[in-house]
Amino acid sequence: MICVCHRCTFLGALKVGTTKARGEAHAVGAPPAARDAALPDTPAALATEAFLAAVSNVTMIRHCIRTYRFGRLLAEKAGAKPDLEVLYVASLLHDLGLETLFDGPEDFEQLGARAAKRFLSDEGHWHLADPVAAAIEIHTQLETANDPRPEVAYLAIGALCDVTGARLDQFAPRVIQEIVAEYPREGTKDLIVALIARQIAIKPQSNIARIASRVDVAAAVRNAPFAG
């Protein structure tokens, strides 16, 4: 069992005012981003945070949380109702296959899905293992945005929003500023470009390499309307 104090350590490392965010989450008149600031705190969510903190770095973890924040807000705007626990856990683990510990000869999406399923199953969170793995495995495919499963669709949409700025025009500038201030972007573009370049170099037949053969992925990341 992961106690809530682990979340304070986890978010504290990201320089997030957890107590303030939680206090404002349901405050009357709180701005949209503040109301959305409360992250799922189920046992599975807390266990996943602790796991990710042990295997990843701050820049990647911030990207994962922003993926959830953008995905959740975009789902809300569209009237979609994803299971927030599934969406959050999938967001935290969606790039697990890019971590050296979990990398291998297969596509990083497949490796990440498998590692996420194994972790969740080993922790006893069987109800999440399959839906989280399903979302992770196809999160880089453009058609996934139209998937009828909202958790699958909005993981892909949230990740693309944070990486390239897609659909960012649906947000008021202050909402974007609040999310980025809470989970800073320093080093995000450099990290993602480097990780993708590595995947293409060592796996020229991979899914991400095929995408890069059609789209200048590095330019799309670099040109995203974010400072970092």
Predicted regions, residues:
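Glycine-rich, flexible beta-strand/loop modules in the N-terminal catalytic cores of phosphate-handling
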Residues: 31-33, 45-48
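Active-site metal-coordination segments of metallo-dependent hydrolases
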Residues: 56-65, 100-111, 126
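Short coil-to-beta-strand
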Residues: 38-44, 82-91
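Short helix-capping and hinge/turn segments at secondary-structure transitions, especially at repeat
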Residues: 76, 97-101, 117-125, 138-145
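Acidic/histidine metal-binding catalytic segments
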Residues: 63, 80-86, 123-136
